[in-house]
């Protein structure tokens, strides 16, 4: 498999403003065409209107970044932190500071310094465990080196294993070390069974620690570590959205023993300044969305512009990715619209016709479509061609044929699922997953991401030479399964075709609980593959920025679908809290 070729195709409160809630009395709507005296009974998912409407988004104002003094402080603090980072001595002290910078969300200011420090530590790898045999230090070194693409073996933890093959009993009370060990275990790759066993061991002991702590009053110096353990058990840092984690950690960091006040103050100011930038971007994107007028014609689709923008913040929040966020927000909204048309509203005849028109990619065929589909096709056609123009202008390559093809592939899988629903077909688990990795929309998302993000695109990197690139397939598997775990029960209740959980149950006679455990295991295995790609990022011909963004997409997916359908029904999950903390609620200064 050629590592540099990507396969994207079929081979593969703050005063939150709530609109008045609308209620839909039934699950089907009637549609009579003016041309034919035929009445179609169309389904409806009863999606609620947006929680944040256009006027509310336009009213956003971040009071913490208006003062010139705040911006001046940010510049001063930024350089003071840089000076501290460059002057700090001792490997463990350097690792601790890098970890704090990352968790506080300000490490993007010091990418070169961090890389140089980690490269030197990697060149001297093994000194920490040889000198200290400290579980926390060894684990943190392992985490940061793998996180930044340096090669380090799981054998680094062998020094903590007794002659009986188990972790030494003296580690039982080393909660700080066990927490770092637990976090390190999530960087496992395929066949690294020792790390997988380590995860089970650390999880068990940390869970016992939380249970024991609930029976007593924690000392002040234990509060920080207890909160960190609870957070990790809920979501390991490696699987968490970086911006969301930074917002949480800023509040927790001040409880840490020997915390650095300079880092804390700079992190708070920087978070608010970035949040203000994101709010301005969201206003512009909301204005674009409002100007399309689509929601006046397509009242059956999910109006989720804020949620879609939140996805892009999870993928890359840094200022230099403003254009990428704009493009991806548009792609997410296009996917949502088309998914709802295929999944809920369109008739089979309409969907087959629409798929055919998209494959031809010719506006001369638009008159064959019903009116609502004409609008959708022209919207898709114009937006994708504009992206293609931007890439041609900036990078000299015509990507429109590739973009058109990946949308065609996506709609063909949507159509397949619609046929399954109409005919009552129950696919095998393998059949479902072969279709599902494409219908997940990940190949579509990643192709657009690669086109606008990479400076080294070519026909070769976009051509389907490798039938199943590991990055694309692994990310697609995670989104497909995470989405199914969160939404399949509700979708089955409204009569949808079987999802992965049900297909696995039918095929293996497993219980729903067993099937869900299997899906979680597949998600974990997919992360192992992604970890392998991240570990070899420095030698991969794929841009590291692309690999990191793909991993971040998985983090958003698992966050959005952890407690239910956080995109379609955010009010029923924690998505509302997540969005408010990242986009609307500044850090008090």
Curated annotation (Swiss-Prot):
Transit peptide start-stop: 1-25
Requisite cofactors: Mg(2+); Mn(2+)
Main location: plastid
UniProt keyword list: Chloroplast, Lyase, Magnesium, Manganese, Metal-binding, Plastid, Transit peptide
Catalytic activity: (2E,6E)-farnesyl diphosphate = (3E,6E)-alpha-farnesene + diphosphate
Coiled-coil spans in chain: none
A Pfam family hit: Terpene_synth
Binding site for Mg(2+) 2: 339, 343
Key word Transferase present: no
Binding site for Mg(2+) 1: 339, 343
Comment block on domains: The Asp-Asp-Xaa-Xaa-Asp/Glu (DDXXD/E) motif is important for the catalytic activity, presumably through binding to Mg(2+).
Protein role: Predominantly involved in monoterpene (C10) biosynthesis. Using GPP as substrate, the major product is (E)-beta-ocimene with minor amounts of (Z)-beta-ocimene and myrcene. Using FPP as substrate, could also be able to synthesize in vitro sesquiterpenes (C15) with (E,E)-alpha-farnesene as the major product and with (Z,E)-alpha-farnesene and (E,E)-beta-farnesene as minor products.
Protein name: (E)-beta-ocimene synthase, chloroplastic
Biological source species: Arabidopsis thaliana (Mouse-ear cress)
Biological classification of the source: Eukaryota, Viridiplantae, Streptophyta, Embryophyta, Tracheophyta
């Amino acid at each position: 498999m050629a590592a540099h070729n990507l396969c994207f195709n079929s081979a593969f409160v703050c005063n939150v403003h709530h609109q008045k809630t609308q209620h839909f009395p039934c699950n089907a709507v009637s549609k009579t065409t003016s041309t034919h005296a035929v009445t179609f009974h169309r389904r409806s998912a009863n999606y609620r209107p947006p929680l944040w409407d256009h006027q509310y988004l336009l009213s956003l104002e971040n009071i913490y970044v208006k003062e010139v003094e705040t911006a001046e402080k940010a510049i001063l603090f930024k350089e003071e932190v840089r000076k501290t980072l460059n002057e700090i001595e001792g490997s463990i002290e350097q690792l601790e500071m890098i970890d704090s910078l990352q968790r506080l969300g300000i490490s993007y200011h010091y990418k070169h310094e961090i890389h140089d420090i980690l490269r030197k530590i990697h060149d001297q790898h093994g000194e920490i465990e040889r000198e200290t045999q400290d579980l926390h230090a060894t684990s943190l070194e392992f985490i940061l080196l793998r996180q930044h693409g340096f090669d380090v073996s799981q054998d680094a933890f062998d020094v903590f294993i007794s002659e009986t093959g188990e972790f030494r009993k003296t580690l039982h009370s080393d909660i700080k070390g066990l927490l770092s060990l637990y976090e390190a275990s999530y960087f496992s790759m395929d066949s690294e069974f020792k790390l997988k066993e380590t995860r089970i061991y650390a999880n068990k002991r940390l869970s016992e620690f939380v249970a024991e702590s609930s029976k007593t009053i924690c000392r002040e110096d234990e509060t920080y570590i207890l909160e960190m353990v609870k957070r990790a058990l809920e979501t390991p840092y490696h699987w968490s959205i970086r911006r969301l984690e930074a917002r949480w950690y800023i509040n927790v960091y001040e409880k840490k023993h020997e915390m650095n006040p300079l880092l804390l103050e700079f992190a708070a100011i920087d978070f608010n300044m970035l949040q203000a930038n994101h709010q301005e971007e969201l206003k512009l994107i909301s204005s674009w969305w409002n100007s399309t007028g689509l929601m006046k014609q397509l009242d059956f689709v999910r109006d989720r512009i804020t949620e879609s923008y939140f996805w892009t913040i999870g993928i890359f929040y840094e200022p230099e990715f403003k254009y990428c966020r704009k493009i991806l927000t548009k792609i997410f909204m296009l996917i949502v619209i088309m998914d709802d048309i295929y999944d809920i509203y369109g008739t089979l005849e309409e969907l087959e016709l629409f798929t055919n028109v998209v494959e031809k990619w010719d506006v001369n065929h638009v008159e064959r479509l019903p009116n609502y589909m004409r609008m959708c096709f022209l919207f898709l056609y114009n937006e994708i061609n504009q992206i293609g123009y931007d890439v041609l202008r900036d990078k000299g390559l015509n990507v429109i044929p590739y973009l058109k093809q990946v949308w065609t592939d996506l709609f063909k899988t949507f159509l397949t699922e619609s046929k399954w629903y109409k005919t009552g077909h129950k696919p095998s688990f393998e059949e479902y997953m072969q279709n599902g990795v494409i219908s997940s929309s990940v190949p579509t998302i990643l192709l657009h991401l690669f086109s606008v993000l990479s400076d080294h695109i070519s026909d070769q990197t976009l051509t389907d030479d490798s039938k199943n690139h590991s990055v694309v397939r692994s990310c697609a598997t995670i989104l497909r399964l995470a989405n199914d775990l969160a939404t399949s029960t509700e979708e089955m209740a409204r009569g949808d075709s079987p999802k992965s959980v049900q297909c696995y149950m039918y095929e293996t006679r497993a219980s729903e609980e067993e099937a869900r455990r299997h899906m979680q295991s597949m998600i974990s295995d997919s992360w192992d593959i992604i970890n392998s790609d991240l570990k070899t990022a420095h030698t991969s011909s794929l841009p590291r920025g692309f690999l990191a963004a793909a991993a971040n997409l998985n983090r958003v997916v698992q966050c959005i679908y952890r407690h239910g359908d956080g995109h379609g029904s955010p009010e029923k999950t924690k998505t509302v809290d997540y969005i408010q903390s990242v986009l609307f609620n500044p850090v008090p200064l």
